[in-house]
């Protein structure tokens, strides 16, 4: 399983191993409206997806095989309930070699897909949105923190997180 956002800091499943990994052909982007978990229908937030192009540093998990039937249905529902993602088996580069991992990539045909927005607009959206799992700001800042702690550098996300933590502009 490949994680690039909240799966890094909230995997919600048992795993036997976790490795840093690079996925080529997709990049981490705030490209999905969240109208439940990090926003509402009236005030949607933005959450991460793997959009086409570039590359993404994240982690791959080797799942605890005997426990997969216990937690995989909830994980599948978490990622696939809105139709926003497409499940794919893709090669992820680790220091130990390439491993095939289940990756949830952005479905650009989903009505929740967001193309590029100006950074100031992204900041404003994230600051005002909150949903079932809390403020959208917390989601973005926590993802940036978890990436740093895992040894993953995402300069654009770090800049965004600093702006969000600095208070109103």
Where are these regions (language model features)?
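A glycine-rich, hydrophobic/aromatic-adjacent loop/helix-cap motif
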Residues: 1-169
